[in-house]
């Protein structure tokens, strides 16, 4: 996990401060003047779902970490959350629901905790009904040219911070990995 910024942060913190969750380098938090930027790579539950239990524990701990930051100032969370939140966030929801890592109900519940706990999915805020908009495609069977994808990369913001977000986007046309860039446009006073 890395962040490149034109703005020098006030502070940079690695991890979430819980030993059992801090050995994989999954979180990088930057304190900026008006908000915290938290870059995250959420644990994948694994092909055989062997890490699903750990994932559930991690989701709870990560949410608590975000809420602790939010007591200080608004939070912008970005990164690979390794979950398709709604059935419109993946090409084949019926085939994958409760069978595939990234679309297990337990993982969806973790995302619900975020969205019901004060964080807004910026892309869905601006494009609530957009279909076929994905940020990840398996390298298997030519999934990307067929647009058989998943939207698992997000920008979530503290809901009171939402008026500062002017747009959210997915750059599907950019290749380079099995993921594509996602982003937001902010309107912040100088």
Q: Language-model segments: what does each one mean?
A:
Residues 17-18, 43-59, 95-99:
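Surface-exposed cleft-lining segments at the edges of enzyme active sites
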Residues 169-190:
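Surface polyanion/phosphate-binding segment centered on an Asp-His-Pro turn
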Residues 1-12, 140-163:
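Conserved beta strand-loop-helix elements of the APE1-like EEP
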Residues 1-45:
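Structured beta-strand-rich core segments of catalytic domains in phosphoester-bond hydrolases
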Residues 6, 30-33, 158-159, 184-189:
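Active-site beta-strand termini and strand-to-loop segments that position acidic
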Residues 18-19, 144-147, 172-175:
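Short Gly/Pro-enriched turn/cap motifs at secondary-structure boundaries
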């Amino acid at each position: 996990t890395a962040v490149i910024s034109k703005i020098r942060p006030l502070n940079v913190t690695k991890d979430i401060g819980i030993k059992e969750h801090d050995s994989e380098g999954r979180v990088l938090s930057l304190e900026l003047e008006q908000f915290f930027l938290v870059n995250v790579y959420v644990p994948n539950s694994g092909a055989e779902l062997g890490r699903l239990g750990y994932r559930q524990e991690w989701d709870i701990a990560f949410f608590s970490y975000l809420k602790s930051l939010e007591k200080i100032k608004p939070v912008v969370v970005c990164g690979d959350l390794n979950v398709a939140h709604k059935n419109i966030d993946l090409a084949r929801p019926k085939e994958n629901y409760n069978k595939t890592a990234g679309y297990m109900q337990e993982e969806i519940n973790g995302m619900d905790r975020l969205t019901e706990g004060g964080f807004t999915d910026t892309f869905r805020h601006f494009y609530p009904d957009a279909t076929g908009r994905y940020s990840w495609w398996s390298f298997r069977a030519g999934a990307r040219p067929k647009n058989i994808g998943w939207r698992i990369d997000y920008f979530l913001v503290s809901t009171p911070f939402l008026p500062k977000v002017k747009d959210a986007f997915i750059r599907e046309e950019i290749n380079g990995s099995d993921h594509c860039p996602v982003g937001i446009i902010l309107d912040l006073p100088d």
